[in-house]
């Protein structure tokens, strides 16, 4: 991990198109501004972890759930059959 010390108004450049600016420091809180292209997703760590957890939960589908979906599909003829 690279550790840098910056003062209010100073910046850090990442790559060619991401700039982080220290805007304000109050006690143990630091307010930063981030300039980045729209396609770069920027999340606070706690939101990233929550999103990751939700994605894992959403991907956990039981075989019975899948069978139920397939049975409800009118074109489904069962395993080993062709349509």
UniProtKB/Swiss-Prot annotation:
Mind telling me which NCBIfam families this protein's record contains? csrA, PRK01712.1
Native organism taxonomy: Bacteria, Thermotogati, Thermotogota, Thermotogae, Thermotogales
Q: Output the HAMAP family linked to this UniProt entry.
A: CsrA
GO molecular function terms noted in the UniProt entry? mRNA 5'-UTR binding
Report keywords, A-Z: Bacterial flagellum biogenesis, Cytoplasm, Repressor, RNA-binding, Translation regulation
Signal peptide from the UniProt entry: none
Domain of life (superkingdom): Bacteria
Cellular component GO terms, alphabetical:
cytosol
Quaternary structure, per UniProt, is: Homodimer; the beta-strands of each monomer intercalate to form a hydrophobic core, while the alpha-helices form wings that extend away from the core.
Q: What is this protein called?
A: Translational regulator CsrA
Which family is annotated?
Answer: Belongs to the CsrA/RsmA family.
Function in brief: A translational regulator that binds mRNA to regulate translation initiation and/or mRNA stability. Usually binds in the 5'-UTR at or near the Shine-Dalgarno sequence preventing ribosome-binding, thus repressing translation. Its main target seems to be the major flagellin gene, while its function is anatagonized by FliW.
Cell compartment(s), UniProt = Cytoplasm
A Pfam family hit? CsrA
**Its Gene Ontology biological processes?**
bacterial-type flagellum organization; mRNA catabolic process; negative regulation of translational initiation; regulation of bacterial-type flagellum assembly; regulation of carbohydrate metabolic process
InterPro entries this protein is in? Answer: CsrA, CsrA_sf
